[in-house]
Amino acid sequence: MASRVESAAWRALQAHQQEIAPLQMRQLFAEDSARFERFSLRWQGMLCDYSKHRITARTMELLLDLARSAEIEAARNAMMQGQPINLTEKRAVLHTALRKPQSVPFAVDGQNVAADVAEVLAQMEGCCNRIISGEWVGYTGKAMTDIVNIGIGGSDLGPYMVTEALRPFAHGKLNVHFVSNVDGTHLSETLKKLNPETTLFIVASKTFTTQETLSNAMSARAWFLQCAVDAAHIAKHFVAVSTNRAKVVEFGIDEANMFRFWDWVGGRYSLWSSIGLSIAMYLGFEKFRQLLAGAYAMDEHFCSAPLESNMPVIMAMLGIWYSNFFGCTSHAVIPYDQYLHRFPAYLQQLDMESNGKRVTRDGTVVDYATGAVIWGEPGTNSQHAFFQLLHQGTQIIPADFILPLKTQNPIGAHHDMLASNCFAQTEALMKGKSEEEVERELVAAGADAATIAALLPHKVFPGNRPTTTLLLDELNPFTLGSLIALYEHKVFVQGIVWNINSFDQWGVELGKQLANVILPELQASSNAAAHDSSTNALINAYRAQRYC
């Protein structure tokens, strides 16, 4: 297949970028009073304002031409139909099937996927109801008060983010904790707060062999048995989300408390599956269903809306515009809601593990940029940390601003202040402040000519910095589900345009392989000598401190 950069659509965008580069957004707004209406979308309690981008109507036409030339709609349909679009692992990509209503039949290769999903959801619901009601008791007859999810990557980031985001919707009968890092500090600090008599552990590992997860699970098991003593009690305090029945049973978990999921669910898309058990326990199962319903609603929008009014497609193509035609290498996500403080970290895995690829689907090294670096922190904290670089740095960094219109905590004028900061930042990034404006300000403040000359270059803001603003009527289980699915589909569209496989993650493997080599060397009786001089020296410095 010819490189994307050789296509007519790509070349047209390259030429257009040269034409549009000198344009200032403040000029575009001044010339078009309907610019916001022209470049914004409303959908089910969500507003996407993309008018503060370096685009014209012609830009969007050309970007959508590129999307069509990449056959976005055919690729989308292939994913939704369960075709094995994960080519390197020969797997379907069906996380969207997890959130379909049970009344919607769905089969792949003769397998009734809808029935399989319904069966696991029913198992999850039954378990959640028993835990929440207090029917499920531990080895001393006490009900559970704390849930500890032990997982890593997609088995941690998604559930952790969702439970933090939806904390106001929790039923309040259970505390939830997450342990992911193999650093013993993470587990130790968590266990200090807990009573083994009232703690339930969820061990989330598809293979039940993941090093970090199994190390933490075994240490949690040992901690539990210090009090419970009898290994038979493990079945009352540990459940598993896995497909490895033999390993689960060997650990001491009752097979009836193993919640399965499927190869067609990638880790970073797995919160909708039984990996979301901690979410369902913390919120209650009805709220978990609302989360699924919100994601399904976005799936339907993605599948049915024309490209011109398709929110995931628009956001994806704007990302392509900056990555491939402006040379931008990173993208900031700024949620103006403290409950979404883990959302940027969740998106890091979703986006960077999906689209951080250097070869096309047929194995050819790409000759264009692919995945961007995703990063961010909540506003207004971020304004006092890294917004200096966004406003006056040498890099153009597109940013998404996310704000729920309704707050869950209406304290005084706090939410008004939060919203005013959000809107002000997008305006400031777009407009900037010219030399003339700075000079007028300084003159009005009584500055003399020398002071003005000295300060002027430091106080100029170039502006023309692009942002998308997403307004949610409210952050709740439904809208959060929609928001997550919006970004999932954005990432998918970009992967198709870049002609890469967004659903494998071979880059995770090499470091794990080498760690398995180095681990016994750390514990060996002699110094390491089999690596490069740097790695040998680091291993030996560790050994000298820990073992010598």
Curated annotation (Swiss-Prot):
Its main location: cytoplasm. It is found in: Cytoplasm. It comes from the Bacteria. Keywords: Cytoplasm, Gluconeogenesis, Glycolysis, Isomerase. Its EC number is 5.3.1.9. It holds the Pfam family PGI. The active site is at E353 (proton donor), H384, K512. Pathway: Carbohydrate biosynthesis; gluconeogenesis; Carbohydrate degradation; glycolysis; D-glyceraldehyde 3-phosphate and glycerone phosphate from D-glucose: step 2/4. Coiled coil: none annotated. One of its GO terms (biological process) is gluconeogenesis. GO terms for cellular component: cytosol. The lineage of its organism: Bacteria, Pseudomonadati, Chlorobiota, Chlorobiia, Chlorobiales. SUPFAM superfamilies: SIS domain. This is Glucose-6-phosphate isomerase. One of its GO terms (molecular function) is monosaccharide binding. Catalyzes the reversible isomerization of glucose-6-phosphate to fructose-6-phosphate. InterPro entries: G6P_Isomerase, G6P_Isomerase_C, Phosphoglucose_isomerase_CS, SIS_dom_sf, SIS_PGI_1, SIS_PGI_2. It catalyses: alpha-D-glucose 6-phosphate = beta-D-fructose 6-phosphate. PROSITE patterns: P_GLUCOSE_ISOMERASE_1, P_GLUCOSE_ISOMERASE_2, P_GLUCOSE_ISOMERASE_3.
